[in-house]
A protein has these predicted regions:
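Short alpha-helical segments enriched in small residues
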Residues: 1-86
């Protein structure tokens, strides 16, 4: 895995721990890579809550509430869909 990605993930985890926060992620094209990268860090059960991989457009709509209209107009790989996934 890319060293820069691992470094950024470790930095995020330090901030989560310092703030006493937990994280939930929603992914699509990355296919779970973000969740995998984060949970590879020791102690993940202390700050990692859950993850969704909604690769299919139907899953984005059903699970995350992404607007079908936005998917049709902008496409799955768009800033608008990413914002709705968040």
């Amino acid at each position: 895995m890319d060293v820069e990605i691992q470094t950024d993930a470790a930095r995020l985890v330090r901030r989560l721990r310092q703030a006493g926060l937990r994280i939930t992620v929603a992914e699509s094209c990355t296919g779970g890579l973000l969740a995998s990268t984060l949970t590879d860090i020791a102690g993940a059960s202390d700050w990692f809550d859950q993850s969704w991989v909604t690769y299919a457009n139907d899953a984005k709509t059903r699970v995350l509430g992404v607007s079908p209209d936005t998917l049709d107009r902008k496409g799955a790989v768009s800033a608008e869909v990413a914002i709705q996934m968040a």
